[in-house]
């Protein structure tokens, strides 16, 4: 928390007197935590990764294990940071709906003993360095500065690659369309389950296409904008007009 790469994050805390307070803490982890019983009762299990999300990661990308949590809900398995992914196998926790829990909302077991299992002490990261670098890549590419965009993209991929030259090869094309697709892909995996994907899809104008292809047919073009509160429209005395189709 509050690392050198944190641009803006909401500060949260738990205390002995207020271990689970939404006044000094947040429900960020509780809402997304592993939903189970006993020691696996870590939250509500919302905002889960899909099979499509899992398939988006390139072979060997370490960000997959840092994003998607593979759990075998068993009260006989101890919880440690080391046994929350690969030892459980790479398959969804629920074969029925093909979803994965969000590892970025997985809390420190030692702190659970002190402050409850639901992670009210975890800060909420709003903007981080990787996001900003990919913003720069996207902006440069849309301005036709493809060489600059490629360099920004490689900064993110190189960091994820680490010392393993066999994964995440450099994107060498300077074609604007190819780079656009590569940058959009990189945002999906670098920022996976950090709550920005929907807004990216809307911003790119492809929300209907992508969501409908994933079976989320409830999304309609009007949902790109939120409805204006009627009270505010009334107070504006005709200045504000309701967004289309609301």
Positions of PLM-derived features:
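Long, intrinsically disordered, low-complexity segments
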Residues: 1-47, 119-126, 157, 169-246
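Flexible, polar/acidic helix-loop-strand segments at domain edges
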Residues: 5, 57-129
